[in-house]
Amino acid sequence: MSDSSENQKATPYAISWNELATPDTKGAIRFYTELFGWKTEKFPMPGKDYTMFKLGDRTFGGVMEPMQPGSPPCWLNYVSVPDLGGTLEKAKKLGAKVCLDVTKIGEAGEIAILQDPQGAMIGLHSC
């Protein structure tokens, strides 16, 4: 998640990031760059390779290997929230399960991942 561009301020409670988890990151990068003309940029993360997708000056997503080995490839949307801890607590009260508690992602802020009561995954990103 990039916060390097002044014109990329996140809108609270809007989807602000899209992340692809796949064991074949090279194949996915090749597919999406050829299909849509997206550009890529490496983003340093401890212990993981992370590649961000860009279109023009806008960075909007990334690709990495799944956090859980053996997980099927999938896209995950992140919603920007001004109070990550408070939003997680509210989500739990509404029946969500926290899959990844608040985690710092370098200079790009903090994230968390939850499963909604219907079973769908959603990411949260501090804004």
Question: Could you describe each region identified by the protein language model?
Answer:
Residues D24-T25, K54-G56, Y78-M121:
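Vicinal oxygen chelate
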Residues G37-F43, K97-V102:
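Short secondary-structure junctions
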Residues W17, L35, Y50, L76, ...:
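Residue-level detection of beta-strand scaffold positions
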Residues I15, R58-G61, P82:
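The feature marks the first
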Residues Y32:
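Catalytic core of tubulin tyrosine ligase-like
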Residues M1-I29, C74-N77, H125-C127:
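N-terminal beta-strand motif that seeds the catalytic metal site of vicinal oxygen chelate
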Residues S4, W38-C74, P117, M121-S126:
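Conserved short beta-strand elements that form part of the metal-binding/catalytic scaffold
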